[in-house]
Amino acid sequence: MTDKKVIVLAAGGTGGHLFPAEAVAVELRQRGYDVHLVTDERAQRFVRCFDEEHIHIISSATFTRRHPFSLIKTFWMLLKGMGQSLALFYKLCPVLVGGFGGYPTFPPLIVAAFMRRVTFIHEQNAVMGRANRVLAVFVSAIAGGLLSQNNRYAHKTVLTGNPVRDVVLNAAEIPYYPSEGEKPFHFLIFGGSQGASFFSRIVPEAIALLDDNIRQRLRIVQQVRGDTEELIKIYRQMDVQAEVAPFFDDMAERMARSQFILSRAGASSVCEIAVIGRPALLIPYPHALDHDQAANAALLARVGGAQIISEKDLNAQRLASLLTEAFCAPHLLEKQALAAKKVGQPYATRRLADMAEALIVGRSLSDVKEEFFDENAA
């Protein structure tokens, strides 16, 4: 057993929940804490920054509206997870327990709150997820990635931002260059794991409607899901320069090189666009729970850093018109890029760690908020 103070971080077993937890864990370890992860069995293929001794798999389940038997099973799994969490906390004696979303955070955070441990949750989106909505009542603090501080828990909400990768921070150093004259116009399209197929259909249809001189300047980079060969063939027939792939290792760099981005509005996408500072057309995924993507996009649009169009209102003609407008107004895109960058939160990982340490030593959240506000204003 180590003499270091123990912090337990809980996260759902998907990359979206685990990445911010891992980023904060690395930062807290550098500050001398012994950090453990509580998650579910899905996490094995995503976890990168924890060794086996520091990963604790607990029972959990997602609430559904299906058969009553499913509800009984869910309650049983959550109760089992609470028992496992209780045993773990008696063993580790954590000074802080933090949650990063997903139902596996529910048992440990509830148990920690009733044990009167210091607790926090991190909400990536502008709208709280279902597990976090319940946990918000019990925890000591709420760290907001995109969540407004003007919510019903404003007294304990601190705007920290969402942790972004180091490659994103490096890309943020690259200034935005408008495409003027006959310079190439770099157009980046990505849809994340949800709804990329919509872009695979509508983007080439829109490109076909553009004037020849615009198509000649276009340099397309498009992330797709399963339509790669067909899309490459379509762009080749139109004589449009395009790179099409299911995944790009250097996505942050490609974002930085782009003049315009077409994207969904997941929390990580919106935050990376803002930190790097690029103009974007955001199409919220219409089937997202709680319509969180629409709320995420609205935050960037409100400051003039992006445009929003719902999927049902976007067709090939509309997209072609918007692309033509973007070509003809390079300095307007430059203004959008600057507006987006002003609301980016590049120091989110450090701020989350700062907030965690403040909670451990009993500092008031109002002091933490004031400190972060002064940093933003500087």
From Swiss-Prot:
Subcellular location: Cell inner membrane
Biochemical pathway: Cell wall biogenesis; peptidoglycan biosynthesis
Coiled coil recorded as keyword: no
InterPro entries found in the cross-reference section: GlcNAc_MurG, Glyco_trans_28_C, GlycoTrans_28_N
Residues annotated for UDP-N-acetyl-alpha-D-glucosamine binding in this entry: 14-16, 125, 165, 193, 293
Catalysis performed (reactions): di-trans,octa-cis-undecaprenyl diphospho-N-acetyl-alpha-D-muramoyl-L-alanyl-D-glutamyl-meso-2,6-diaminopimeloyl-D-alanyl-D-alanine + UDP-N-acetyl-alpha-D-glucosamine = di-trans,octa-cis-undecaprenyl diphospho-[N-acetyl-alpha-D-glucosaminyl-(1->4)]-N-acetyl-alpha-D-muramoyl-L-alanyl-D-glutamyl-meso-2,6-diaminopimeloyl-D-alanyl-D-alanine + UDP + H(+)
EC number: 2.4.1.227
One GO BP: lipid glycosylation
Pfam families (alphabetical): Glyco_tran_28_C, Glyco_transf_28
Membrane topology term: Peripheral membrane protein
Cellular component GO terms held in the UniProt record: plasma membrane
Keywords (A to Z) from UniProt: Cell cycle, Cell division, Cell inner membrane, Cell membrane, Cell shape, Cell wall biogenesis/degradation, Glycosyltransferase, Membrane, Peptidoglycan synthesis, Transferase
Keyword Cell membrane applies: yes
Leader peptide range in chain numbering: none
Gene3D superfamilies in the cross-refs: Glycogen Phosphorylase B (3.40.50.2000)
Top-rank taxon: Bacteria
Main location: membrane
SUPFAM superfamilies noted in UniProt: UDP-Glycosyltransferase/glycogen phosphorylase (SSF53756)
GO MF annotations, alphabetized: UDP-N-acetyl-D-glucosamine:N-acetylmuramoyl-L-alanyl-D-glutamyl-meso-2,6-diaminopimelyl-D-alanyl-D-alanine-diphosphoundecaprenol 4-beta-N-acetylglucosaminlytransferase activity; undecaprenyldiphospho-muramoylpentapeptide beta-N-acetylglucosaminyltransferase activity
Biological role: Cell wall formation. Catalyzes the transfer of a GlcNAc subunit on undecaprenyl-pyrophosphoryl-MurNAc-pentapeptide (lipid intermediate I) to form undecaprenyl-pyrophosphoryl-MurNAc-(pentapeptide)GlcNAc (lipid intermediate II).
Similarity section: Belongs to the glycosyltransferase 28 family. MurG subfamily.
Protein name: UDP-N-acetylglucosamine--N-acetylmuramyl-(pentapeptide) pyrophosphoryl-undecaprenol N-acetylglucosamine transferase
